[in-house]
Amino acid sequence: MHDQSPADPADPSRPPGPTLFDWEFATDPYPAYAWLREHAPVHRTRLPSGVEAWLVTRYADARQALADQRLSKNPAHHAGPAHAKGKTGIPGERKAELMTHLLNIDPPDHTRLRRLVSKAFTPRRVAEFAPRVQELTDHLIGRFEGRGEADLIHEFAFPLPIYAICEMLGVPREDQDDFRDWAGMMIRHGGGPRGGVARSVKQMRAYLGELIHRKRDDLGNDLISDLIRASDHGDHLTEAEATAMAFILLFAGFETTVNLIGNGVHSLFMNPDQRERLQASLAAGESGLLETGVEELLRYDGPVELATWRYATRPLTLGGQAIAVGDPVLVVLAAADRDPERFAEPDTLDLSRSDNQHLGYGHGIHYCLGAPLARLEGQTALGTLLKRLPDLELAVPPTDLRWRGGLIMRGLRTLPVRFTPRND
C-alpha cells in the first residue's frame, strides 16, 4: 500500500503530492520530501503496514519533536492496535525484556538507564578502540584488494561494524561469525516478523544472556564487563537490562554504520569533485576535511531516514497541525537535513560545510549514544578506502543499484566496485 498526498480541498491549486514508499521513492526520496516540506510539512499518512502516522519534515519542527517529552517512545501510548502489537520478530516470551532499552522508554526510567550505560560507553573507551578499528579496516580491505573488484556492502561496510562492536562488547572471536549471521538475517528482512528473524533474535538474546552471566564471575576489559560494573549510588543494571542494552548497542550500532559507509561511498561516487577534494586532503596528510566530510555525508544522505517511533501522550500542535493523544509521530531526519530554511544549498554535497548541526544522530535526550563510535568507524573506513584504493569506482551503472526497503534505515543492498588490484 502506498500513500499519495491528496490535493488540498482548501487550495485546489496545490498539485497532488508524490507517491511515498514505493520503489522509486526508496531509490531517491528527496524530491518527495522537498514537496512535503513545502506543501505539507507535518503530514498524516498511511504507512505500508497500514498504520497511520504523522511525518515531520521541516528542520525546526523536527528538532521540536525530537526534544518534546509529550512525545513518548513507549509503544504502549499508541492509540491504535496495529503497531502496538509490535511486529518485531522478537519471540513473545522475551519481547518485553529485549524491548526495554533506551530507544523505547521515557524518563525517569530512561534517565536512570542512560546514566548507567554512559558510565560504561565512554568517549575514552571509543578513543582507546581506534587502533583496533584501523586494524579491522585494513584486514577487511586486504581480503579483496588483490582481486580488483568487491561488493563493498557485504565485504566491507557490513562486517566492519559487526566485528568492531562484538570486540568492544567482549564477544570471543570464535563466536563473532555467529553474530554476523544473526545480524545479516535481521538486516536482510528489516526486523520483520519472519521465522528466520525470530530465530536469530532468540539465539542472539540467549547468547548475550549467557555471556553476561559468565562475565559476572570473570570481568574483563570490555563493554559488557563495564555495563556490569556500572554503578550510580548503589544502583546497577539488572541482568535483563544489561542483556537488552547489549542487544540494542549491537543491533542499532552496526546497521547505522553499514549505511554510513555505503551511503557515504555512494555519495562520493555521485559527487566526484568532492571526492577529489577529499583524496587530495588525505594525500597531504590532513584530517580536517575527512572529519567535516563525514558530518556532511551524515546530513546529505545519512544512514537513518526516519527517527524511531514517538507517540503523543498529550494533545500538541506541531507545524500547525493538531496531534491527538495516541497519534504516532515519525520525524523524517532525511527531510529535515535537506531543509533550505536551515542549510544553504541543502541538495549540494559540501564536505567542508561548517554550519552543520544535522540531525543524523537525533537530538535531545535520545541522541544516539553510539555516535562517537560510528563517527570513528566512518572516518576510518572512508579515509582508508580512498587512500588504499584511489581509483575505486562503481562497477555497475548507478541506476542498477538497489536500495533496501524499510521505514527507518536507508541503505544499499549491494555496492559493486572495481579498482586496480593491489598485491603488495
Enumerate the predicted regions with their spans.
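Cytochrome P450
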Residues: 1-424
